[in-house]
A protein has these predicted regions:
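Charged, amphipathic alpha-helical oligomerization/scaffolding segments
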Residues: 46, 91, 115-118
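Conserved nucleotide-binding/hydrolysis micro-motifs of P-loop NTPases
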Residues: 1, 25-27, 55-61, 68-70, ...
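Switch II of P-loop NTPase G domains
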Residues: 2-49, 57-74, 78, 132-139
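Flexible beta-alpha connector loops of hexameric P-loop NTPases
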Residues: 26-32, 69, 80-84, 103-107, ...
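Amphipathic alpha-helical coiled-coil segments with heptad-repeat character
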Residues: 37, 70, 77, 82, ...
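Conserved beta-strand/loop subsegment of P-loop NTPase cores
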Residues: 19, 48-55, 76-97, 144-153, ...
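C-terminal-of-GTPase-core extension/linker across diverse P-loop GTPases
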Residues: 98-176, 186, 195-196, 201-280
Length: 280
């Protein structure tokens, strides 16, 4: 955009945007009304995708929802996923009688009933499917069917600690995939996917690009560093990122992940009045 603005001699630059809505935190038992309960779940239901911010740094002054100071990303992720699954199980349970009633007039609904029953059983076993049959969901808008980004909030060292990042990525894969998946080598700066053949003929991708085949996106960000970057010029921010061994801000990584997981892309228009990026 800046290059086009220079070419056309305009100062008006309108970038593409992705809107993130900050909803209240989720606690265990939300599906039964604990905490903000149904209000939280309703807020998620209105979103196109879920971005789960997971604390992955140690601090003696920051408490988890259960009052503990020790960081436990695996437990935090399991709490969220469990509540989403329980909410979806209840949704399917409430919907099945309606579909069953309609079966008399529409025998084709038998496959839908079988699918929903199987899906409910899978969720009851604690397994989130890698893919969903949207046609058979009948507009249920299940929470577990939404694409998800796991945003791990790490400390400064975590931005380049490939061992820590690989461990965190394994938590996500083990939590969401029914298959035996081993993460590929992590891209140090997260600037793109690194495809790698698997023994079963499928393709692995780097930890920060796990959206294919139902896998989530994984992004590592240091919120403390991001707050510093907001106060700096572009040149100063670039220099600070270089000091930490990364080439892209966490905010930029998150935007790219959101575009990828939602299947969005941008096209540009330019002229003497403005340069604009459009989202499609």
């Amino acid at each position: 955009l800046n290059v086009l603005a220079d070419m056309y001699g305009t100062d008006k630059i309108i970038p593409a945007t992705v809107e993130f809505v900050d909803v209240a935190g989720l606690v265990a038992g939300a599906s039964q009304g604990e905490g903000l309960g149904n209000k939280f779940l309703a807020n998620i239901r209105e979103c196109d995708a879920i971005c789960h911010v997971v604390r992955a740094f140690e601090s003696s002054t920051i408490l988890r929802a259960d009052g503990a100071t020790k960081t436990d990303p695996k437990s935090d992720i399991e709490v969220i996923n469990t509540e989403l699954m329980l909410a979806d199980i209840a949704t399917i349970e409430n919907h099945l009688p309606k579909v069953t009633k309609e079966l008399k007039s529409d025998p084709k609904l038998r496959s839908t009933i079988d699918y929903l029953t199987s899906l409910q059983s899978q969720l009851l076993s604690g397994d989130i499917p890698d893919s969903f049959d949207d046609e058979k969901l009948h507009g249920l808008d299940l929470l577990t069917a939404k694409p998800i980004i796991y945003l791990f909030n790490v400390d400064e060292n975590g931005l380049t600690d490939q061992t820590q990042q690989a461990e965190l990525a394994r938590i996500v894969i083990n939590t969401n995939s029914a298959g035996d998946v081993v993460p590929a080598r992590l891209q140090q700066d997260g600037n793109g996917a690194s495809d790698k053949p698997r023994n079963d003929g499928r393709t692995e991708r780097s930890q920060e690009s796990l959206s294919p085949a139902g896998y989530p996106q994984v992004v590592f960000i240091c919120a403390e560093l991001e707050s510093q970057l907001r106060e700096l010029s572009v040149i100063e921010a670039t220099e600070l990122l270089a000091d930490y061994g990364v080439t892209e801000s966490g905010l930029a990584k998150l935007a790219h992940a959101a575009y990828d997981i939602l299947g969005l892309q941008s096209y540009l228009t330019a002229g003497p009045k403005e340069v604009r990026a459009w989202t499609i």
